[in-house]
């Protein structure tokens, strides 16, 4: 810390496990959150690691993808992984025995939203009039397009990319456009691109960690049955 110029005073007073009780809920806080005063407060953990635990991951080899604006995919294992493109930390359960390694794709749910906001005015108007989700309408059209989007390929690096590329200057690309392609083709290719980004992370991990099946997915992406099927097809794994 001296070499990096970080004052020791900024560090926590002590290191604790995620399950350690570090305090009690005050009366004021209890009123705000609807819990009892004095409720034990645990140290907790990083957001996606706790989401992994909440998905029921307790054993080595189990893995979860948290898919919202971006992707965070992580696996529980023992020992240090061979692939150093992943980020590794103690797992929230049995932290002395188990590790959690993860990689992330920067752009996931942000891509369908970008497409909808810029190219789906008709679907948004229908949503306002009928209450039907504009994303659901886009899914219906994209489901009619064959896997592979008739040769259309999207690289989903619209906000740079994290694991395993780690390049903030990577940029999104739409390849193979022809006059045959429609809006539905582009939307499906976007969904497929995120699935392949997840597969890229998983394949980078498989060099040193034995992965189990299925892959559990949590987050907003799970609202789309089409997208979940695309993930299953691309990963070759039950979801």
Feature map (PLM): residue ranges:
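A conserved active-site cap/scaffold subdomain adjacent to cofactor or substrate pockets
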Residues: 96-123
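Short beta-alpha connecting loops at secondary-structure transitions
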Residues: 91-102, 175-176, 235-239
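Short glycine/serine/threonine-biased micro-segments
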Residues: 42, 59, 66-67, 95, ...
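Generic, well-ordered alpha-helical scaffold segments in large soluble proteins
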Residues: 3-4, 28, 32, 114, ...
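Short, well-ordered loop/turn and helix-capping segments at boundaries between secondary-structure elements
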Residues: 58-59, 79, 117-124, 196, ...
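Alpha-helical hydrophobic/aromatic positions enriched in membrane-embedded helices and signal peptides
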Residues: 38-39, 60, 101, 184, ...
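Activation-segment/catalytic-loop signature of the eukaryotic protein kinase fold
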Residues: 143-239
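ATP-dependent carbohydrate kinase catalytic cores
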Residues: 1-96, 106, 123, 129-136, ...
